[in-house]
Amino acid sequence: MLHPDGSSRPPTREQAQAILEQLAGPQATLRDDQWTAIEALVVHRRRALVVQRTGWGKSAVYFIAAKLLRAEGHGPTVIVSPLLALMRNQVAAAERAGVHAATINSSNVTDWADIHDRVRNGDLDVLLVSPERLNNPDFRDQVLPSLAHDAGLVVVDEAHCVSDWGHDFRPDYRRIRTLIGELGANVPVLATTATANDRVVDDVATQLGVGGGETLVLRGGLDRESLRLSVVRAGNPAQRAAWLAAHIDSLPGSGIVYTLTVAQAHDVAALLRERGHPVAAYTGSTETAEREQLEADLLANRVKALIATSALGMGFDKPDLGFVVHLGAPSSPIAYYQQVGRAGRSTASAEVVLLPGNEDQDVWRYFSSVAFPSELMVRNVIHALELDRPQSTPALEPLVDLGRTRLEMVLKVLDVDGAVRRVKGGWIGTGEPWEYDEARYRKLDEARKREQQAMLDYQDTDGCRMAFLRSQLDDPDLLDGERCGRCDNCTGSRYDGVVDAAAAEDTRARLMRPGVEITPRKQWPSGLAKLGVNLSGRIGDGPSPGRVIGRVTDLGWGARLRRVLEEPDGEVSDDVVQAAVKVLASWDWTTRPTAVLALDSDKHPKLIGSLARELARLGKLTDLGTLQYAPERRPVAAANSAYRVAALHGSWLPPDPAVIGSAGGPVLLVDDVTDTGWTLTMAARVVRAAGAPDVLPFALAATS
C-alpha cells in the first residue's frame, strides 16, 4: 500500500479493522484468528484453507483482503460461490464496505455482457461466479483467462463442495482445481468452509496447492454456544406435523423448518397456513424472484418460518434466526450441522429440534440410488460423443440411457477429467483415455453409509449432542468428555413428544386428504428417430390431465402407498378404494368418464385389475378389462425420456375399437404408479387410436 513518502508498506491490522467496521458496524472487532488469515493472504500471498464455524466471519476475511489488495493495485477478487442466496448476501455485504461487486449466475443472464465488459475494463473489485460458469464456453474462453492472469485473490466459498468426500460434493467445483493451476504462484487463494472433517480438509488442501506452495490450514473450534440441540420422538408423520403445529408459536423469533422432499415442504406449509401460521414453502423448484421475496420476508420477520428443502442452506444469513427444526433427518450429521448453523449467530440462544421418522431412510436410499452411474453407462456417454461435432445434452439423451440430471453430472465429471469438453453448441469428445475409478466410488458409497449410520447414532445417543456433531467434523478443539451443557441430554430438559390425540387426528385427516393432479406430457423427446420411432414435436393424441391418490414422498399418503407398492400383489384394500373414490369425486373433469380400463402390469396385475373393477362397480362405469401387453414388448428399464418412449412404443396390443366405442365417452385409464408420465401417455395413444374420445389417467401414486 502506497504511503505519502512513496514507500510501499504492507497493510496493517488497523486498516483491516477500519474495513471491518464498514462491513459490520463500529462495534465490530477484528479477532486475532481473522487477522492471521488476512495477513497470510495479503502480506505473505499464501494459499489458505479456513475451516471455522458458521458465524465466525469468513466472508469478512475475504472482503477485507479483497479491498486491501485492490488498494495496493492488484486485480479483482474472484469468488466462486455455489448458491444464489449466498451470492445475494455477499454482494450486499461488499457494497457496505464500499467494494464494487457483481455476480454472474443463472438468474441475471441479461446482465452478463455488461459485467464481462466491467471485468475487462477493471471496473470491478469483486466478481462472484457460480462454479457452473467456470466451464461456460464464452466465460471460459473470453473472461476467465484475463481473470486468471489479473486476479488479486481467488476465493472458494463453501469449499467442502470441492471434495467428493464431502457431504455436498458438486462436480462443477472440481473445475476450480484447473483455475487454481493456471494462476501465478504469487496469487493468494482462500478456501472457506464450516463443514469439513479431516479427510475433506486434506483433499481440499491438496487441490488448493496445485501450482503453488503448501496450503496453510487454519482450523478453529466448531462449538456453537447459542444452540440448544434436541431430538423429539413424536411418532408418525401426522403426529410429527401436529407437534410442529402445536409448538411453532412457542419457538423464539422466526426460523426454518427443513423437510427432506419438495412434496413434504408444500404439504407442511399448507397445513401450517390452514392453522393460521404465517409460513411459506421454499424449494429448489421455487422461482428465483419468489425465492428472493421469501428470503426478504424471513429476514424482516414477516413470516414465522420458511418450510424448506436444503435449497435454503449455504449462505443464507439471518443473524437473529431463532430456530431450526428438521421434520425428518438428513442423511449426514455434517449436513445437519451446516443446516442448524443458520440459527443463533447473533442471539444468546436458539432452538434446534430434530423430529426423525422411520421413513427417513427410504428417502436416503432413493437419493443414494441416483449416485454416479456404472462404468458401462459412463463409457456409453464417451462413445456417443464425436470429436468434431458438438452435441447438446438433449441430443445425447437418445444415445445413452441416462436421465438428464445424471447425464449432466457424468458430463461434468468427464469434462474435468479431460475425456470430454464443453464447447459452443454442446459437448465433444477429446479422445483422451479415461479410467473408471471403481475402488474410489465404492469407498465413497461406503463413506455415505457410515454417515447415515452416524445420523441414526446422533438420534439415539445419550451423550452430548453438540460434542457428537463436533466429533463427526474432527473438531481440533474438542476435549475428551466435553459437554455443551445446553442440549437435551446435557440438561435433562426435553420437549414432550406426546401430541394431543384430537390434534393428531385432525392433522392426519388433512395430510391424508387424497388427490394430486398429474400433468400430461406435451412434447415428444428429441432424437426419437435415431431409436426407430417416428414421433416428434407436440403430442396431439395423449391423455388429459390426470390424478393420483398421492406421492410416495408425501407425509400423508406416502407411507401407505409405499407399503401398497412394496407388498406382494393382491386385491386392492378398502382404504385405497375409498381414497380413489374421493379423488374421483373431487375431480373437476370437463366430461365424466364412461368406462374404466386397467393397464397390464408385471408387478401388480391383481392390484390394478381389482381397483379398476371396483371403480367401475361403484361409479356405474363400463368395465373394459385390461389393456394387454404385446408378447414382443421390450422391457422398460430406461432412465431417460427418449429410451423410455422407444421401449414403450408397441408395448400394448391394440384394443378392439368396437369394445372401446361401446363406452360411448372418455376412458379412465388405471395404473399403479406414475414416474415420468410416459407409460400413461403411450398407453393413452393406443386407447385413443381405438376410438376413445379422451383418456383420463389415474394411478395410485406418483413418485414425485
Model-derived features with residue positions:
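C-terminal accessory region of SF2 helicases/translocases
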Residues: 303, 325, 329-338, 344-545
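A short, structured active-site edge motif that brings together acidic residues
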Residues: 106, 220-222, 284, 597, ...
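Active-site-facing substrate-recognition patch
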Residues: 227, 508-595, 604-605, 609, ...
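Helicase motor core with emphasis on the C-terminal RecA-like subdomain
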Residues: 10-13, 18-22, 28, 32-59, ...
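Arginine/glycine-rich "motif VI" loop of SF2 helicases in the C-terminal RecA-like domain
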Residues: 342-349, 589, 619, 688-692
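PRPP-dependent phosphoribosyltransferase catalytic core
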Residues: 491, 507-514, 681-704
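Interdomain "pre-motor" coupling segment immediately N-terminal to P-loop NTPase/helicase cores
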Residues: 1-7
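Active-site signature of alpha/beta-hydrolase-fold catalytic machinery across serine-
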Residues: 63-64, 68, 203, 610, ...
